[in-house]
Each structure stands twice: as C-alpha cells, then as structure tokens.
Amino acid sequence: TFGPTSKGAKIEWSKTYALDIVEKLAPEMIIKNYNITDENELKDIINRYEDDSFVVKPEGLTGGKGVKVGGIHFKGKEEGYEYAKSCLEGSGNVIIQDKIEGREFTVMALTDGENIVVTPTTFDYPYRFDEDKGPGTGGMGCLSFENGLLPFLEQSDIDECSKLIKDTLKLINKDSLEFNGVIYGGFFKTKN
C-alpha cells in the first residue's frame, strides 16, 4: 500500500503531534505556541497579545481551511478569540501560535518509510484573491521553478528541510506509527 497507516498519518491530522516532533528535532525552529484545552486558559493567552498578531490552529483535519491568521482572516483579538473558542468547543483543544513574517513553501517527499525522494519545492496560493486576501481555498494552486527551487530559497534551505523530513520519518516510525507514501513538509523562510 502506498500511504501511511492511520496511526502513521497522525502528523497530518494532529497539529499537537506535529509541534511535538518539531520541538524534539529542531527546537530552534519552533514558533512560540500554546496548546489550550480550557476556555479560561484561552482568555489568558489571548490577553497576552497586544493585538491580533497570533494564529489560531484547530486540532484535526480541516481541509486546509482551519488555520486562521490574525490581520488576514480575523481582525482584532476579540474576533480571534471567538474563532479559537469555537475550535476549542469543537475538538477539545486549540493551538494559539505567534504570527511570524516570512515566505511559506512546501517540500514534499516520497518515502518507503526510510528513504526519501524530494519533489520540486512549491509555493502555494491558498487564498482566493491576490495578495493573500479572501477565504482559504484548501490548496487552489501552487507553482515551482524548473530548477526545483524558489527565488527566495537556496539549495542549503532544501537540504535542511530534507534532513528534517528524514529525521521526522525516523521518529514517526520509532513511535511505531508506520509511514510510507508522500510526506508533506510545510516551512517558512524568515529573515533569521
């Protein structure tokens, strides 16, 4: 079978599990985040932000439409809080994460669970309108360049991402969560 077991696919549907993996493998890459299971805790965390400079990530699969970014998908802390509260009520937990500035890109790899073959790097256009405006589409389109890189990336960036994907597979399979198929790595290139 080409594709992970349902346990192996946990990295796709559990943002908490995915963040735990990043924390173990590349703590320097982790974005400050809070895994919230209680409404009082949610209020406390949201009140720590001066404005809407945070991201709300519901737990579970959302078809590419669940993550909401402050200043783009919601305006102001209160609107972000209301969305996070609805996520919390739906699944029992929600992740609040600092908003970062950078360019998002995707590195996918085909894997047999041990070896990987990296596909050309892509840049997604997940919003309906230009300039990242409008509702999320869940993956309306993407682009790549003939050299497999994007203008804002170096080969060393891809090498680092590939290593992280390979290390992620080792960790998933060490946890007895069998993974083969296509693993999707979502990354941000920031100034630092």
List each model region and its residues.
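Short acidic active-site motifs
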Residues: 41-45
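Conserved anion/nucleotide-ligand pocket segment
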Residues: 53-72
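General beta-strand structural signal in soluble alpha/beta enzymes
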Residues: 2-4, 31-35, 55-58, 95-98, ...
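A short, GP-enriched loop/loop-strand-helix hinge that lies immediately N-terminal to
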Residues: 1-14, 26-37
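Short gly/pro/ser/thr-enriched loop/turn and capping motifs at secondary-structure boundaries
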Residues: 7-12, 62-63, 126-128
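Internal nucleotide-binding/catalytic subdomain
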Residues: 67-192
